[in-house]
């Protein structure tokens, strides 16, 4: 897959869509759309009437009936074409993904030991739990987690990004995807899925899934359109006997014909939005994929448009994410070198960027070399989201580093005293927007390591846009409240959650949802999975863990947490497109009434000619012009349905006024102009 944007009307896509639009004329396919199914039945009935007239079995104007039948079929075909074109774009994207999926040979290890026994096995035979080693130049055979090693990986086949990425054990960049290529070094990977369940397989099935589930708003709108169709159907059915009765009573005029009744019905029902509704939904998912985000369903895209609370991780979303150790700040009585030595020891097995930067800073400041933890008989204590600290046990030294509250609990649990001087150091670092990392040895606090982070350029303006859209932004961070408050003020977020734990994230989401709000968040770690599963829109990072990707309802192939803002924009654009075209369609119908109703009943009530405010040539030309316009307007709106309406951040009332002016008033005016032009053309060409 590449990031190359498909043009809206590529010749291949149009050719395939034209063929698919004919195939979709099968009754089973038409039945899924109640509005267009009525048009489909009307097309068939007028065709039968036209054939009967040609055969002399039925009295009527065969030329007029044939033209009505032809344009009713065009209406069906144009609606099919819109949906087929939207689906064709998704199928083309799926085809490029299928080109990535291929069977290769993998080197399977019998144990987690890189130097242990190994054997060759086809990639499609690998199962969850199998361990493989991938050397430079080889293809990663399965989705999995890196358990040893680090390498430069080319993920362009999946993400479209040509720049290689680093995948390594530990941290948030340990997840690898089958079908990508190792460019340098080596990786030992534990497979996390069985054959047929890989991320690539799921991407393909999501993109090309023929049985697209309708979203709740789409279902609600379909019910409304169906109800309107049934009402107009009942009205039109009663008009024929009413017309016959009127002619008999008045002894003048002619009854309305079945052909005109069918044309009247098709023009009364909301065929414009009925024909484009499915295409809008498919195109929404396609636009999401063009942004390198895979949505599990249209429901997720639609929910993104309704979101009013964004939970954003500080690191990588609001800040650049590469926090680096900048300073060792010892407490009184402790030398800076002793603090640096303890901090380095606790970080030797720490795979995070922060841990590595501490090792580098200690080496630069005091020429402290890395030591082998095995030779020291040391036990590394990994970071936990629950304890919020990590460290090492070496000989009689128990060294820990972590958040200030976590170290305080650790010291107090070991009957030590947490000095006030540390609080002063922590506040000094926090007020500058840095992150304080407290280091302790046994029951004694040694000092603070200052970590620097930088707020991304332009992020404050983006949050201002969110605010204008009525969306509340909340920064989530493990930092203390002072640091969080400083960065939140600099970034311009509405609120923040400091010292966040998985339980705190989950509780915050549930709190907002209990207030009737829809919540969106991003995540990449296993500890994010519960909150991702609870959120209404959950965007998991492709570089994250398998648990996070399974808990989310979207996956960002670029692993860019800031993408959440773009996801919300695409979701709102899809809802705006559906709402705008619905407004345009209903306004269209109101305008069409002025053209077709006087024309339809002119033969029964000649006095109704006074309502011919557009001065159309004749009742037959008026009816045919309206039917032709009803079909052509679908074609003209296909680009808008697929690309989406232009969306600018503003409050709901201003947005409503803008759309009523553009699509409401535009929908009223367009039919008057279009029908009149078609009537003039018909008068010149065929009608007398």
UniProtKB/Swiss-Prot annotation:
Annotated residues for binding of Mg(2+): 524, 528
Active site: 313
Alphabetically ordered keywords of this record: ATP-binding, Cell inner membrane, Cell membrane, Ion transport, Magnesium, Membrane, Metal-binding, Nucleotide-binding, Phosphoprotein, Potassium, Potassium transport, Translocase, Transmembrane, Transmembrane helix, Transport
EC number per UniProt: 7.2.2.6
Top-rank taxon: Bacteria
Transmembrane segments: 35-55, 62-82, 219-239, 260-280, 594-614, 622-642, 667-687
Location(s), subcellular: Cell inner membrane
Coiled coil (residue ranges): none
Keyword Chaperone part of the UniProt annotation: no
Single Gene Ontology MF annotation: ATP binding
Reactions the enzyme catalyzes: K(+)(out) + ATP + H2O = K(+)(in) + ADP + phosphate + H(+)
One Pfam family from the record: Hydrolase
Main location as per UniProt: membrane
PANTHER family linked to this entry: POTASSIUM-TRANSPORTING ATPASE ATP-BINDING SUBUNIT
Record note on quaternary structure: The system is composed of three essential subunits: KdpA, KdpB and KdpC.
HAMAP family: KdpB
General function of this protein: Part of the high-affinity ATP-driven potassium transport (or Kdp) system, which catalyzes the hydrolysis of ATP coupled with the electrogenic transport of potassium into the cytoplasm. This subunit is responsible for energy coupling to the transport system and for the release of the potassium ions to the cytoplasm.
Family: Belongs to the cation transport ATPase (P-type) (TC 3.A.3) family. Type IA subfamily.
Protein name in the entry: Potassium-transporting ATPase ATP-binding subunit
Organism for this UniProt entry: Photorhabdus laumondii subsp. laumondii (strain DSM 15139 / CIP 105565 / TT01) (Photorhabdus luminescens subsp. laumondii)
Protein's gene: kdpB
